[in-house]
Curated annotation (Swiss-Prot):
The winged helix domain is involved in binding to DNA in the preinitiation complex. It comes from Methanococcus vannielii (strain ATCC 35089 / DSM 1224 / JCM 13029 / OCM 148 / SB). Transcription factor that plays a role in the activation of archaeal genes transcribed by RNA polymerase. Facilitates transcription initiation by enhancing TATA-box recognition by TATA-box-binding protein (Tbp), and transcription factor B (Tfb) and RNA polymerase recruitment. Not absolutely required for transcription in vitro, but particularly important in cases where Tbp or Tfb function is not optimal. It dynamically alters the nucleic acid-binding properties of RNA polymerases by stabilizing the initiation complex and destabilizing elongation complexes. The lineage of its organism: Archaea, Methanobacteriati, Methanobacteriota, Methanomada group, Methanococci. This is Transcription factor E. GO terms for biological process: regulation of DNA-templated transcription; transcription initiation at RNA polymerase II promoter. Keywords: DNA-binding, Transcription, Transcription regulation.
């Protein structure tokens, strides 16, 4: 399941782009139940970093924990376990949001006219370019009409990829 690119992208966002999170998830999946301290030792990563990742995963409801108090030391031990059954629904929700944004962006690209500063590599809508007198606000250079066919093709490819994943991957069928 974790080798799916859409799932990886969503997990990457959940873990705020911390790649160690994938290692943490793999340890959880392999062990089924493990303490944060054991994960820290196994991965040779600071305990605080492991806990931060676990809390992010917990907020997304992708892990659960049990808390036990050691009667001798009065310290709590947290045992973590994966709870990935909610992952497909989370992926679908996030990907639908991305899909909506891509479709809005495509509509803007299809219905708009754009201008481009070759020096600064900045793109502007016709309205913005007109307001600026067809001059770049950063370098003062002349703005040129921009052919956005490649941009539209890229957006269409991204939309098709996500829609294909939803339609062909059994992981997402019930959502």
């Amino acid at each position: 399941m974790l080798d799916n690119p859409l799932i990886q992208q969503v997990l990457f966002e959940v873990m705020e782009e911390d790649v160690v999170g994938f290692d943490v998830l793999n340890v959880l999946i392999d062990s089924n139940e493990v303490t944060d301290d054991e994960i820290s030792r196994q991965l040779e990563v600071k305990l605080n970093n492991i806990r931060r990742i676990l809390y992010k995963l917990y907020e997304a409801r992708l892990v659960d924990y049990n808390r036990e108090k050691d009667e001798e030391t009065n310290w709590y031990t947290y045992t973590w376990k994966p709870s990935l059954e909610k992952l497909p629904a989370l992926v679908v929700k996030k990907m639908k949001n991305i899909l909506d944004e891509l479709k809005k962006q495509l509509s803007t690209e299809e219905n708009g006219m754009f201008f481009y500063c070759m020096g600064c590599e900045l793109k502007f809508t016709f309205e913005d370019a007109m307001d600026m007198g067809f001059r770049c606000p950063q370098c003062g250079g002349v703005l040129h009409e921009y052919d956005n066919k490649k941009d539209m093709a890229t957006i269409k490819e991204q939309i098709a990829y996500i829609e294909d994943e939803f339609n062909q991957n059994p992981l997402f069928f019930k959502y």
